[in-house]
Amino acid sequence: MVTIRLARGGAKKRPFYNIVVADSRNARDGRFIERVGFFNPMARGQEETLRLDLDRVEHWVTNGAGTSERVAKLIKDARKAAA
């Protein structure tokens, strides 16, 4: 099954997550199909916390992709901010 989920990056104690579309059988940080955004939980000051390509997310969800719980919340937050 194709899922939209977080892939961890960044440094030790400084997480940075790419929001990716990947096959659920692949490793968390492994091969992915498409990168649709990022999430920076440690953003300071004017740094961007969340960027998401909502058009591509909508495309994947309508084509049957599932989302992780955290990504579903981030999508909801991004839609709220865009409106």
UniProtKB/Swiss-Prot annotation:
Gene3D superfamilies: 3.30.1320.10. One of its GO terms (cellular component) is small ribosomal subunit. Pfam families: Ribosomal_S16. InterPro entries: Ribosomal_bS16 (IPR000307), Ribosomal_bS16_CS (IPR020592), Ribosomal_bS16_dom_sf (IPR023803). Keywords: Ribonucleoprotein, Ribosomal protein. GO terms for biological process: translation. PROSITE patterns: RIBOSOMAL_S16. This is Small ribosomal subunit protein bS16. It comes from Shewanella woodyi (strain ATCC 51908 / MS32). The lineage of its organism: Bacteria, Pseudomonadati, Pseudomonadota, Gammaproteobacteria, Alteromonadales.
